[in-house]
Every structure is written in C-alpha cells, then in structure tokens.
C-alpha cells in the first residue's frame, strides 16, 4: 500500500486549504489515480488496523439494496450512524441506487444484476457500469454518494474495475473504499469464473481533514507490511448470497489502529 502513503504525502505537500460542507477545513488536491494489482495481495492498509468487519458487512448491505442501519447494528457496525434519522433510515443512498434505480416509466433498475449479466454474456461491452449519482434523488439522501461511479473491464480472463470517487476522506474513508471495491471485484470474478485483475481508484476532491493531521503524520512514520490474502470459502448461487463468514483474510499483520474524528 505504498501508493496510499504516497497519496497522503502528496496531499500534505501540494494540497490547497479549502473550506468544506462539514466546517472542518481540509487540505485538498484534485485528480489522482492509484492502481492495485489484486493478484499481488488484498489491498488492505497495513500502516494502521482497518475494521474488516465493517467493510464486509457494509458491502453486503449495499448489495441487498438496504438503506436502513438496522442490519449494520445487528452486526455491530456503526459507521453510518451519524447520518441516519431517528428510525435508522438514510434515504435512497448506495443500496437503493445499485439495486432499484427509479426509471421515468416507473420501473426500478437493478444495476448489479444488469452488470452480472453483461459480464457473463457480453464481457467486451464498454457499458458495464454502475452509478450511484442519481441527480433526481440527491436531495433525499442523508449523504450524497462519495464513491459515485464504477466500471468493469474484462481482458485475458481477468476482471478489473475502475472507481470514480468524487470526494475522498484520505485518512478515514479511503482505506475502507479501496478494500470494499477490491472485495467486490473478487466476488464478481468468482461468480463469473474469471481471475481478478486490477482495481483502479480515481479521486476527484481528495483531501485530508484539518483534524487528521497528527494521525496522518503518525501513519506516514510507519513502514508498510506485506499485504494479506483474501480467501473466499465457498461460491454462492449469486452475488447476493454471500455471507460474512464466507470471507477470510490470511496474513494480515497491521500496525495498531489510529483513532480520528469523523467529519459529518
């Protein structure tokens, strides 16, 4: 994960001070890309411990089309609590857009099922895309999508994915995002009998919050360790049938966790 630390340093060295929606203040750069070869290890940050339980359960929650935090709470995941209303609802966030994008004619489009069918039946298509950025529903969402648009690409029997993230909290959010989409690529590759290729991350407003500077310098002082390996223990009938216990990370030996406040 050397490229992640290099991004942190780049934001420190080249970032512009900007105000933001949360009132916290950031150092920000615009436009950055990282590429992770998923055959060389699972891209889970090692310079601090990442909460893998939250990453896995959040992705499974997205894939079910869920937008209420009840499932997350049942599994001791609290990462969405700050944005939920008193009933645990978040509005039409990621899960709704992935699984039930509302069309003008009243249909609801399941983008994940569409993508799975494309990967199996038309893998050379240049339209294997999922978007969470539904302009007509942004004002109903508790939080507008940060990781907003992703595309799959098949070549030489390998499945790759590129994500466009319009807003990126480099210290807290980005390690989750990288691991989550890497996990999704592994799951989709298994379902389609493909090998994994690359995960390409592209960031728009890529920033460090002003109250994460001490933590960032601490993390930069640490030496990255070997990447772990993801093991998927079974092949379910569909992309929607995975369970938390299907996943195991082997050889994850991170430095201790580093706490930091969330900008809401």
Swiss-Prot record:
Pathway, per record: Pyrimidine metabolism; dTTP biosynthesis
Keyword annotations of the record: Cytoplasm, Methyltransferase, Nucleotide biosynthesis, Transferase
Cross-referenced CDD domains: TS_Pyrimidine_HMase
Sequence positions that bind dUMP: 21, 126-127, 166-169, 177, 207-209
Entry keyword Ribonucleoprotein: no
Binding site for (6R)-5,10-methylene-5,6,7,8-tetrahydrofolate: 51, 169, 263
Active site per database record: 146
InterPro entries: Thymidate_synth/dCMP_Mease, Thymidate_synth/dCMP_Mease_dom, Thymidate_synth/dCMP_Mease_sf, Thymidylate_synthase, Thymidylate_synthase_AS
Subcellular location(s) of the protein: Cytoplasm
One GO term (biological process): methylation
A GO term for molecular function: thymidylate synthase activity
Gene3D superfamilies: Thymidylate synthase/dCMP hydroxymethylase domain
Disulphide bridges, residue numbers: none
Catalytic reactions on record: dUMP + (6R)-5,10-methylene-5,6,7,8-tetrahydrofolate = 7,8-dihydrofolate + dTMP
S-adenosyl-L-methionine in keyword set: no
Enzyme Commission number(s): 2.1.1.45
Subunit comment: Homodimer.
Its biological purpose: Catalyzes the reductive methylation of 2'-deoxyuridine-5'-monophosphate (dUMP) to 2'-deoxythymidine-5'-monophosphate (dTMP) while utilizing 5,10-methylenetetrahydrofolate (mTHF) as the methyl donor and reductant in the reaction, yielding dihydrofolate (DHF) as a by-product. This enzymatic reaction provides an intracellular de novo source of dTMP, an essential precursor for DNA biosynthesis.
NCBIfam families in the record: PRK01827.1-3 (NF002497), PRK01827.1-5 (NF002499), thym_sym (TIGR03284)
Protein name: Thymidylate synthase
Organism: Citrobacter koseri (strain ATCC BAA-895 / CDC 4225-83 / SGSC4696)
């Amino acid at each position: 994960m050397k490229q992640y630390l290099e991004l942190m340093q780049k934001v420190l060295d080249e970032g512009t001070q900007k105000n933001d929606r949360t009132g916290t203040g950031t150092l920000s750069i615009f436009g950055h890309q990282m590429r992770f070869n998923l055959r060389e290890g699972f891209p889970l940050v090692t310079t601090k411990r990442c909460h893998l339980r939250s990453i896995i359960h959040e992705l499974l929650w997205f894939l079910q089309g869920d937008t209420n935090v009840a499932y997350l709470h049942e599994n001791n995941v609290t990462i969405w609590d700050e944005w939920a209303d008193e009933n645990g609802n978040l509005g039409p966030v990621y899960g709704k857009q992935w699984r039930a994008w509302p069309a003008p004619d009243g249909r609801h489009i399941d983008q994940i099922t569409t993508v799975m069918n494309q990967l199996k039946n038309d893998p050379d298509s240049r339209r294997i895309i999922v978007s969470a950025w539904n302009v007509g529903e942004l004002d109903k969402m508790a939080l507008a999508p940060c990781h907003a648009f992703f595309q799959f690409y098949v070549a030489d029997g390998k499945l790759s994915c590129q994500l466009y993230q319009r807003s990126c909290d480099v210290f807290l959010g980005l390690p989750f995002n990288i691991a989550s989409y890497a996990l999704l690529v592994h799951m989709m590759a298994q379902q389609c009998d493909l090998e994994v290729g690359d995960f390409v991350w592209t960031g728009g407003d890529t920033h460090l919050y002003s109250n994460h500077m001490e933590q960032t310098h601490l993390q930069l002082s640490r030496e990255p360790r070997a990447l772990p390996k993801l093991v998927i223990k079974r092949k379910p009938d569909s992309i929607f049938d995975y369970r938390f216990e299907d996943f195991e990370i082997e050889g994850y030996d991170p430095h201790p966790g580093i706490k930091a406040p969330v900008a809401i």
